[in-house]
């Protein structure tokens, strides 16, 4: 069974911890997903690690990174930007609005990165 959890993932949040780093624990059916987030001090770097405990059948785990530019006081409306995606093995480089001096890098330990184009969230809000 595959559902669109992108906009409703918060409904599956079971717990939140913040000792040294934030840990979000989600429960979907019988699958437990822990998301650990760590930022490197003084750098524009973040690491997101997922730990999945699935004692049942095989499942598909899809991560959809959201790239968003907004003032932290406002809601994203209909602003669009261009993305250039470069994929080599398990490393992804994304350039936004043709600015190679500020790329986003992602490293994937398992699975595959799938390029997406024209995926836009309209009127995004945060709960």
Question: What does each of the following model-derived ranges do?
Answer:
Residues 1-127:
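Acidic, mature catalytic/reactive cores of soluble proteins
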